[in-house]
Amino acid sequence: MDTSAIQQTLVKIYQRQAWQPPRKASKNETTVGKPRELAGGGSPADGGFRPSRVVVVAKTTRYEFEQQRYRYAELSEEDLKQLLALKGSSYSGLLERHHIHTKNVEHIIDSLRDEGIEVRLVKRREYDEETVRWADAVIAAGGDGTMLLAASKVLDRLKPVIGVNTDPERSEGHLCLPVRYTHSFPEALQKFSRGEFRWLWRQRIRLYLEGTGINPSPVDLHEQQLSLNQHSRAFNIERVDDERSEASGPQLLPVRALNEVFIGESLSSRASYYEISVDDGPWEKQKSSGLNLCTGTGSKAWSFNINRVAAQAVEDVLNIARRQGNLTLPLNKELVEKVTNEYNESLLYSPEEPKILFSIREPIANRVFSSSRQRCFSSKVCVRSRCWDACMVVDGGTSFEFNDGAIASMMINKEDELRTVILEQ
């Protein structure tokens, strides 16, 4: 917990006359502490938007995943049902969610075809660069994970990517359209056609990899799960397209991070050893549980949960401040909640802001290793690995080997923006 940041938040509150019920934001006012996407941000649509060809990327449901996972065992449906029961999972429950998702995907496809739009339906394995080039727009039919997958192969900043939550009861869908359009997708298409929406240009992180023994070939973590291989073995398997080199200059990796990049040892119980340089500053040796670099989009995902503080911790800090004689106001639940919420909301920023928020997870601080900044905004971050079995994971789905001698450079470039839409509820 960053206690100095909490104290700064507390000072800001004291300096205001803030002990009144918060007023409701006006219609045209940005909500305090929230990214602009939550308050109707983005840029107005220049006329309507009506694609001719759309690719729909459908998520793999848990039911489909379990089927694929044991496909080599040639299990019958009854065998699968019994196996899931042994693991404490409900076969009927998984099948029900699968049917709900499938029905909503069919609704999306039928709605598109009713408008005369050519449609391709693909799953993860069929989704490739050729499919993206064919389409005028990409629709992610699933949840946030499917949206991240769909965005990962779209490098053209002018090609829209739209998320539709196909199971709102079980999926949050922060990156998707409001849930009402799950069952009313024709209405969404009409609003697109009339220009009744706003573009949101989400910034993404581009990655360069250089150094000794690097391998720029990615590993699909979803496919790895299906292969039942442990992550520590992922980079030891023999691959035809292995492009490992003894030493090389910077190579631009074929993915962009919409949410975040995580760097750390594959075995979470092992400390990650690396050197870090922020905005071309001096290199600093660190040991920690890894580091997270996020965009404004990802600031309310993993990064938020790494950095957020609990009300209990805030109350403890305020009690210490009161004992030191620095707190004159009465300590009550309202004060604790106000400080907690303001601090946590300060961790969020607009998806359109061209900056990276990096966070060090559980830094080790002693006479050898330091952590001068546990969390900081930056425009460029470079990391040199001193790890043994580490990985660099993009949006939780694509992994790159990142061991001793490898150097990763991460930055924001306007060319990498992702074009998404905002529709009102």
UniProtKB/Swiss-Prot annotation:
| Modes of activity regulation | Inhibited by NADH, NADPH and NADP(+).
Major localization class? mitochondrion
Ordered alphabetically, the record's keywords are: Acetylation, ATP-binding, Kinase, Mitochondrion, NAD, NADP, Nucleotide-binding, Phosphoprotein, Transferase, Transit peptide
Q: Mind telling me which Pfam families this protein's record contains? A: NAD_kinase
Task: Give the enzyme's EC designation.
Answer: 2.7.1.23
This protein's record includes keyword Endoplasmic reticulum: no
Quote the cellular component terms of the Gene Ontology held in the record. mitochondrion
For the modification N6-succinyllysine, the affected residues are 59, 285, 300
Tell me which family the UniProt entry assigns to this protein: Belongs to the NAD kinase family.
Q: What is this protein called?
A: NAD kinase 2, mitochondrial
Native species? Rattus norvegicus (Rat)
Its encoding gene is what?
Nadk2
